[in-house]
Amino acid sequence: MWPTFKGEEWDKGMDQFAEQHFMVLDQFLPPSVLETVCRYFASVEAEDRLKAAAIGPGKERTRISEIRSDFVHWLDRPLMTELETFFDGMDAIRAAIAESLFLSLRGYEFHLAKYPKGAFYKPHFDQFNSRENRMISVVIYLNENWEPEHGGALKLHKPQEILIEPAMNRMVMFRSDTV
């Protein structure tokens, strides 16, 4: 695991997650990893590889712009060697989460998302009704120079309504089935 989250801060976050089903950690990615991910995202944008986001699992996936209007780029580890350090770190963090919370977390999927001005994703659970394999969702914000007037705060609805500002390098983790 990256040295950023070992010890007391990580333990406090895991305790918060166990009690409230979410946690927030700032300065999540080490600087070199953050720089690599931001550079990769910039290349995805420059090469126009972001696609209109859809909802639903697998073959049921469909675009419904009244529910979700952002753009995404799915990350495929074998094809993205420049992100290997990111994936290696997330492997270690997945293992640490599984150990701390006594969960069987076998895999993960990642995508980059862009929300242009006015874009949205209506309230929803990240776990699909038809499948229970998505247990935990993680959001890592890459917003440089974010200001409140830019909008885009994440609203968690359970256990109580909480607004989380999308500050650069902030990680939000929450249960996919309850928050």
Spell out what each predicted region is.
Residues 1-137, 141-171, 177-179:
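Fe(II)/2-oxoglutarate oxygenase catalytic core
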